[in-house]
Curated annotation (Swiss-Prot):
Coiled-coil region(s): none
Main location: cytoplasm
Pathway: Cofactor biosynthesis; adenosylcobalamin biosynthesis; cob(II)yrinate a,c-diamide from precorrin-2 (aerobic route): step 10/10
Enzyme Commission designation: 6.6.1.2
Name the UniProt record assigns to this protein: Aerobic cobaltochelatase subunit CobN
Family from the record: Belongs to the CobN family.
Gene label: cobN
Gene Ontology biological process terms in this record: cobalamin biosynthetic process; porphyrin-containing compound biosynthetic process
Amino acid sequence: MHLLLAQKGTIADGNEAIDLGQTPADILFLSAADTELSSIAAAHGRRDGGLSLRIASLMSLMHPMSVDTYVERTARHAKLIVVRPLGGASYFRYLLEALHAAAVTHRFEIAVLPGDDKPDPGLEPFSTVAADDRQRLWAYFTEGGSDNAGLFLDYAAALVTGAEKPQPAKPLLKAGIWWPGAGVIGVSEWQSLVQGRMVAREGFEPPTVGICFYRALVQSGETRPVEALIDALEAEGVRALPVFVSSLKDAVSVGTLQAIFSEAAPDVVMNATGFAVSSPGADRQPTVLESTGAPVLQVIFSGSSRAQWETSPQGLMARDLAMNVALPEVDGRILARAVSFKAASIYDAKVEANIVGHEPLEGRVRFAADLAVNWANVRRAEPAERRIAIVMANYPNRDGRLGNGVGLDTPAGTVEVLSAMAREGYAVGEVPADGDALIRFLMAGPTNAASHDREIRERISLNDYKTFFDSLPKQIKDEVAGRWGVPEADPFFLDGAFALPLARFGEVIVGIQPARGYNIDPKESYHSPDLVPPHGYLAFYAFLRQQFGAQAIVHMGKHGNLEWLPGKALALSETCYPEAIFGPLPHIYPFIVNDPGEGTQAKRRTSAVIIDHLTPPLTRAESYGPLKDLEALVDEYYDAAGGDPRRLRLLSRQILDLVRDIGLDSDAGIDRGDSDDKALEKLDAYLCDLKEMQIRDGLHIFGVAPEGRLLTDLTVALARVPRGLGEGGDQSLQRAIAADAGLRGFAIPTSAGGNPARDAQPFDPLDCVMSDTWTGPKPSILADLSDAPWRTAGDTVERIELLAANLVSGELACPDHWANTRAVLGEIETRLKPSISNSGAAEMTGFLTGLSGRFVAPGPSGAPTRGRPDVLPTGRNFYSVDSRAVPTPAAYELGKKSAELLIRRYLQDHGEWPSSFGLTAWGTANMRTGGDDIAQALALIGAKPTWDMVSRRVMGYEIVPLAVLGRPRVDVTLRISGFFRDAFPDQIALFDKAIRAVALEEDDADNMIAARMRAESRRLEAEGVEAAEAARRASYRVFGAKPGAYGAALQALIDEKGWETKADLAEAYLTWGAYAYGAGEEGKAERDLFEERLRTIEAVVQNQDNREHDLLDSDDYYQFEGGMSAAAEQLGGHRPAIYHNDHSRPEKPVIRSLEEEIGRVVRARVVNPKWIDGVMRHGYKGAFEIAATVDYMFAFAATTGAVRDHHFEAAYQAFIVDERVADFMRDKNPAAFAELAERLLEAIDRNLWTPRSNSARFELAGIGTAATRLRAGNE
C-alpha cells in the first residue's frame, strides 16, 4: 500500500517516556530551570495550608507519551498551570499544545511565560490567562529571589480563588558581585574581603579571575559551584571575582559589569552562562566579558547528572552541547570543563518532586581553575619570560613528512612565527633562515622515523618520566602499561632516557609531535580503534610540561593527533587521554579556515584557541603539455571541418591515437563504440572542463598574505561564485562580465535541459555546455585577450576568466557602462581583496594576542570560495555552526537536488532503480555546508526535515509520500566520522528516527528499506532475539567508530605497509566502523549487521563540498570512500559503483564516478606544471606535498582499483623522469623523493600499476639508495 498523507515526527522526543507519578493539585508550575523549581518549592514549603502545588521539570516532559500521561493523570485536574519554557515554544510545542487543549476542554487556566527576561509573542497563543496577569506573573520571575517566589504563589492563588492580588514584584539587582556569606556586595567590600584572604607578598598583586554566572543561582541559593570555583582559585593564590548577571544581553547587567571591571579588571574570566551574545553568521557583538582583553573560559554547570556524565562517551547531552558549548564558541570562549552536575538532593512530598541542585565535582573544578590560573600567568609574564613550545605534526611518521599541516607551509610558517616572536621581545635565540633550514636542524636530531645516530638535544630521564607517569590516574597507567609494557621497552628509550624530537631556540622549543603508536605495530590497526599512546608519546608532553616548564603550547597547522586520543567527546574527565597528557595548559592552534570540524575538535577536547589561516592560493588549471597539443589539434580539426575529408580523417586519427596513447580516452569517457565525431566532441568538452578546474597554486605561509598574481587569482576564485543574495556587488564576477558584454544564448545551461530558445538564454559562464559551438557575439574586449581560436562556449569562458583576472589586477580598466561588473569590482576593491591582503598580518596579530594571554576575537569558518567571504580576514578564533539548525533549508535543497541527480545517474549507468547506497558523513563537511550530507541521505530515503520557521531550528522530519516522491525509496547506510558523532547527536537521531518511520507498508519494489527491516527482524527473532529488540537492531543504519575512538583504520596500514591483500583493508574498515548509533544508542557493537548493510549496497557515495582541495590532498577520502568500497567488495563479491559528487556550487551539484574524479584531478592538478611549480616554491614542504599526493593515489588504487596505469604513468613521468622536478626533490627533501619512489615501486609489486617502461622498476629501486647517500653527504 502507499502512504497518501505525509507523516511527521520530532527529534525533541526524550529517549524514553517517563511517568512523573504526581497526584492532581490546584496549581502546576512547570519550568526548564531547576533553580526556579527549587525556589518555588522552598516558598511553598514555608506555607501552611492553602492551595496544593505540583512542580515538574520540562525536561521530564519531552517525550510525547510522557506528556500524554501527565495531562491525563495530573494536568487536566488542575485549576491553573504556569509554564516557563526556556528557548521558546519550538522545544516544547507538543506539550504546550496538549496543555492548551486540555485547558480548553477541562476549563482551567494556563499561563505560558517566557523562560527568560525577553518577551516572546510566540508563546501567547498557548495561554488563556489575561495578558496583564501574565505580565505580573512573569515579573516575579524576572526579578527573582525568595520574596518574589512567595508573591508568585500568592498571585497564582488569587487567580484561582478570586482573592485580592498581592503587590507587584520586588526589584532585585540585575547584576553585581556576590560573595559567600556576604551576599551582594560592592567593589570596595570585595577588595577588602579578598585582601584579607590572600597571603601578602611585597611588590606582587595576585591575578584576578572573574566568575560570571546567572543571577538565578543567587535567587535560588544554588551557589555551590560558584563557591567551589572561588575556593579552587584562592587555593592557587588567585583572587576570585564572582559576578552575576540576568543575561549578557541585558543592558543593565552589561553596564554593571563594565563598572565593576573598570575598578577591578580581571586577567581571565570564567563564564558559566550559556548561549551567545552574537548569532552565528551575523555581525559580531563584543561582550563585556572580554572588554579588558581577558580570555574567557567557558565552564559548564551541566544539566546532566554526574552518573550520566561518567558513563556517557559523549560527555554532554545535546542540550548542553548547544547551549553551553557550540553557541558560546560564537563569542570566542575557550571550553574548559563541566564543573558541576545536577543532583537530586531531596524529595519534596508537598510538591511531589525531586528538588534538583547543582553539585560541583572537585577534580573538574580544580582543572578549570588551573587552566584559568595558567592563562593568567601567561598574561602577567613579560614576553622574554614566557616559555613557549611549538609542535609540528608528522604523519606519515617518516622524515620526508615533517611539519604536516593541510594547505600550510608549516616549516616556513613556523619561522615566520619565531621571527615575529623575536620582534615582540620573546627570548627566541637564533631564528633559522627559512623553513628548509628549520627542517634540516630538526632532522639532525631524533624524529619519529629514527633516533639512533642522531644528535639528542633534549631527553627526559626514566626517573623524571616515572614521576610524571605515577601522577596519572590509575586507569591511564594500567592501560598504557597493559598495552606497551615498561617504559624501557619504548623504541625511543635510549641510554636510560627518552630521546625527544625537540630543539631549543632560547626560551622557545620546537618539536615534532610523536606518533600515536600505530607505527610501532601497524597490524594493531585491525584491533585497536582506541589504541592508547605509547610511553614515548607521554614522555614528550611530560618533558614540555615539567622539565621545560612550557607556559603555553602551540600546535602548528591542521592537524595533530592529540585531540583524537581516546576519551569523551566533550567535558573530558581525568581519564581522558587528551587531558591526562596535555593538562591545563594554554593552547594556541593555527588552523586552516575551511575546516571548522577538526578545528572544533581541538577546541572542545584540548581547550584550544584557534588562529585560523588562509587556504592555499587558488588558480585555474589552464592547459599544458600534451593537453595543450591536443587542444590545438582539436581546434585545427574543427577549423578544417567542411574541407578535405582525407585531412579530417588524418587529423581525427592523429588526435585519437594520441588520446589513447596517454590514456585520456577512458578519463574523457570515450567508449570503444563511439564514432570519431562523438569521441572528438567528448574530448573537446573534457579539455575545456580540465582547463577551468580550480586548483591550488602552492601553499599558504602563516602570517603572509598572497601578493601579485597569487592575490589576483585567489580574488577571482572568491568572486566567481555569487555571495549572499547574489545581487549587486555580490554577483558572480564572471556572470556580471557576460551580462555586460551582451553575451546571450548560444550555449544552453546544462541545468536548463533542452530549451530550443537559445537566443533568449543569457549566457551563463558557470553553467554551460563547454563544447557547444559559439555563434554569439565576440566583443573586442574579449577577442583581443587571446590569439587562440574562439570556437566554443569553453573558449568564451576562458576569455571571460582572462578578462576577470585583468580587471581585478588593474591591468585593464572596466568600461564605464558595465554597471554589473563595476558593482562587483567595487565590492572586490573595498571588501574581498582587502580581506585577503589583510589576512597575513591579522593571522600574526591573532597569534601573538593569544600567546600573550589575551582574548582572540572569534569569527566564522567555512570555504571562502563557496560564497563565504565573511570568513576573511583570517587570524580569528573560528566557530562552527549551531548544530540545532542542521540541516538548513538551503542544505536540504542541495541535498535533495543531488539525491535526484545521483539516482538518475545510477539509473543511466545500470538501467534500474538503486535500492541501497552507502554514504559517508563527516562532521567538518556538514559544519561547512549546514548539513548537505545528512540532507542528501534524508532525501534518498524519501524524508525531509521540518523547521521551526522563527528559530530556524530543525524540529523533526516528514515522510514524503511515494506519489510525491515519484520513485522507489533508497536504503541508506551512513558511515559517520567520529567528529560527526560528537558534534551532531541530534542529526544522528533525526536520521535514525526518519528511516524507521519510512519502514511503511509499501510494496517491496518501492520500499526496500521496509522490506529489509521486516526480513531482518524475522531472521533475528528466529535466532531467539525478542521482537522489540529484533526490530530495533534491524533498523540500524548509522555506523561509526567505537565510542571515544576516531578514524577508519586504513591510514596506518597503508603508511606502514601493514596489509597483504585488499581483504586486510576491508577487515580493518569493518572492525573500526561496526558500532551502531541512533536515538538512544551511543555506539553498540554490531559487526554482523554492519556487514549485512555493506553486503547489499549498490553504490558508495562521497560528497565533496568545495574545490579548495581535492580527493588526492587528504587521507580521509581513501579511508572512508575507499574503505567502504573495499569492505563492500569483500562481502558482496563485486565492487559497487562509487560516486564522488561535487557540491562546490550549491545551485549546481555534479555527479561523477570516482574514476572520473580521479582522472580529472590527476590531469588538472597532479601532473600539471602549474601546480608542480607552485609547490616547488616551498622547498621541503613542496616535495612533501608531491609525495603525499602519490600516496593517496596509491591508496585509492589499493582500495578501489580506480587509479589506472596511465595515471601512475603520468605521475612517474612528472616526478621521476622529469629531471627538473626530480632534482628539486633530491635537493630539498631527499627522504620524500625516496618515499615517492618506494610507493611507486610498491604499486608495481602489488600489481596496481604496470609501467610502460621495462626500466621503471630498476630506476625506482635505485632512487632510495641514491637519495640516502645524498642526504648523508649533505649532513
